[in-house]
Each structure stands twice: as C-alpha cells, then as structure tokens.
Amino acid sequence: MPGASRTIVVNAPIEKVFDVITQYEKYPEFLPEVKGIRTENRKGNTVDVHYKVDVVKTISYSIHVTEERPTRMSWSYIKGEFMKDNKGSWVLEPEGEGKTKATYTVDMALGALVPKSVVSALVETSLPKMLDAFKRRFEAP
C-alpha cells in the first residue's frame, strides 16, 4: 500500500473533524472492522494507540500518534502482526464556511506472506469504505 492517499471535503468545521479523528476509543462505533482499541502513554500531543482490526482475519498492531490540533494527526509504526511498517497522516484544511478538506495518507508495508490480493483489497475497498464512514461521522449532528 505504498503511497495510498485520498482527499475528501466534508460539511463540518475543522475542529470537529480533528476531534473525531483523535477520539480513538470511539472508532468501533462507526468503523466495523475495528474490533478493539486502546490508548496509553499519552504525553502532551503524543499517544500510543493499539488496534485490533478485522481485515480478512483479525490482526493487532500499535502506532505512535502525534496530534497537531487542529490541522494534522500523523502516526508511525510500533509493532504488529503481518506488518513491517505503517505510517501516515490526516491533514486538515479549512475549505470555506463550515467545511473541511481532509487528506488521509497511509504507507503500509505488509509481510512477505500476505498475498498481493489482500493488499489490493485494502487499498481499493477498505480505504474508500473507511473514508465514507469517517465522512458520515464528521457530518453527523
């Protein structure tokens, strides 16, 4: 999944979008593939986030997140199953009255045993579905 990036414009102010992105424990409420999530080691604007996600099979991984309110959230890989690396970001920009341009970028290196078809499915299917779920959450009253 090298260099996968998508941009959406949402009908929500930048602060709300940032809040949704950084309320990690609420992800299972609107992202059905997230089966469990917990945070630890919060220090200022950084936190470690531990995921359990179901993509073909259930895998666990951990990332170190840096939050730059209200315009950016980025992460780097700590450890995980079937993964060699996972880094990326959300970059937020005001887009007119009450709207936000949100760009999601991820660079993920999966293990050699992971079939290319799984990697393609993640990019072509999972990423758009995830962004649609975030958009609905951003725009919810």
Placement of each model-derived feature along the sequence:
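Short beta-strand micro-motifs in enzyme catalytic cores
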Residues: 45-49, 100
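Ser/Thr-centric signal marking residues that sit
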Residues: 22, 100-103
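A general secondary-structure boundary signal
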Residues: 7-11, 58, 76, 89-91, ...
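Generic recognition of short, well-ordered alpha-helical segments
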Residues: 22, 60, 87, 114-118
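A structural signal for short, well-ordered beta-strand segments
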Residues: 6-8, 49, 104-106
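Hydrophobic ligand-binding cavity/cleft-lining segments
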Residues: 1-44, 129, 133, 140
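Hydrophobic-ligand binding "helix-grip"
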Residues: 29, 40, 52-99, 107-109, ...
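A conserved amphipathic terminal alpha-helix motif
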Residues: 103, 107-141
